[in-house]
A protein has these predicted regions:
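Preference for protein termini
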Residues: 1-357
Length: 357
């Protein structure tokens, strides 16, 4: 049995290592190396944002774009009595923050954020619009600090991986969920295709099935198969229209690495053993042919926890009755509490609307 070198596979799937190979077939991106001091900050659990994320700072993000952003975290540390530890002092990363601002501006003022392998989808509840669209550095820092997925990417790595640590900003695009697909490659053969947002139903998929498969197969055979260095991997694509397929990402093949969505990895492995060259032109494409009713929304899995809602709502109620002399760490964090309660209310409103839709 062939022993996999997971570290080398992960390195191949890093955005920084495949972007130039497929630059003409993917979304414009800015890749920003993470300095050691920023990396140490991102690894910490503290919720202090850098000094550059100041209150009511106007951030010019390009022609026609002007963002005014209030940072609720900063007020936790205003009015310091001078006795707090150095560890609680607000950090500053002027050069890195400027690089982020310049990148967002160059991408038109809106960008999709990810680290080397993951996007902070588990933290989008913390943004005002509950979106992964970032418009300024406050959005970037808040998402990175709140995301367990990204924090995992910032952990110490094997010496095999010498590519460093990066923040990736992609030009923002409003993508219809029914136009994203996940493709499974085994032994350099395209075995299967699944809708990326399985098991959601999209009427046009059944109607355009042949065109979808043909377009993805063409991209794979002409651009990816002989270029991407791995034999087994998963890649995601976005198909905005006929004859137009855009590479979104590459990830590791197999259980524990990439969601198999409409398939099972054991089944895919069995099919790979008997696959023929001819079958590569017609990979199995699974999709819902009929509307099965309301399906669970995966985004809600990463929504604001109900326990947290109860805790912060209780903290806010008790803080309203505190006197100045009774203020504690909870009282010092009122601005954060209010911020999180606001997110609770926004999500509750969204959930209620979904229930009545």
């Amino acid at each position: 049995m062939l022993i996999r070198n997971i570290e080398q596979e992960k390195q191949a799937c890093m955005h920084v290592n495949w972007y130039e190979l497929f630059q003409k077939n993917t979304i414009k991106s800015c890749i920003i190396p993470v300095p050691e001091d920023v990396l140490a900050y991102l690894r910490q659990d503290m919720l202090i944002l850098p000094k550059e994320c100041s209150n009511f700072t106007d951030v010019s993000t390009g022609e026609g774009f002007q963002t005014t952003h209030y940072n609720a975290f900063d007020d936790q540390f205003d009015g310091s009595d001078g006795e707090e530890d150095d560890a609680n002092e607000q950090p500053a990363f002027p050069e890195f923050s400027q690089a982020l601002t310049d990148a967002i501006r160059s991408l038109g003022g809106c960008a999709f954020l990810k680290s080397d392998w993951h996007c902070p989808k588990d933290a989008q509840w913390i943004t005002l619009g509950q979106s992964l669209c970032v418009r300024d550095i406050t959005d970037v820092y808040q998402l990175l600090k709140a995301s367990s997925f990204c924090k995992e990417d910032f952990r110490e790595r094997s010496e095999v991986n010498e590519s460093g640590y990066h923040i990736v900003l992609k030009k923002w695009k409003d993508i219809h969920p029914g136009s994203e697909f996940r493709c499974f490659v085994r032994n350099r053969s395209l075995l299967a295709i699944s809708p990326r947002h399985w098991p959601s139903y999209h009427e046009h998929i059944a109607r355009e099935r042949s065109d979808i498969v043909n377009d993805i197969v063409s991209l794979f055979k002409e651009k990816i198969k002989d270029t991407f260095p791995l034999k087994d991997y998963v890649f995601d694509v976005y198909r905005p229209g006929k004859d137009n397929v855009i590479i979104m990402d590459f990830s590791l093949y197999g259980k524990g690495h990439s969601d198999s969505l409409a398939f099972d990895y054991d089944q895919l492995d069995d099919e790979a053993l008997v696959a023929t060259i001819e079958e590569e032109d017609d990979p199995e494409f699974r999709y819902l042919p009929n509307d099965c009713g309301i399906q669970p929304i995966k985004r809600n899995v990463y929504g604001f926890p109900q326990d947290f809602r109860n805790f912060f709502q209780g903290a806010a109620s008790s803080s309203n009755g505190d006197t100045a002399g009774e203020a504690s760490a909870e009282g010092d964090s009122n601005n954060l509490v209010n911020r999180l309660i606001e997110q609770c209310n926004l999500q509750q409103l969204h959930d209620d609307n979904q229930d009545h839709a």
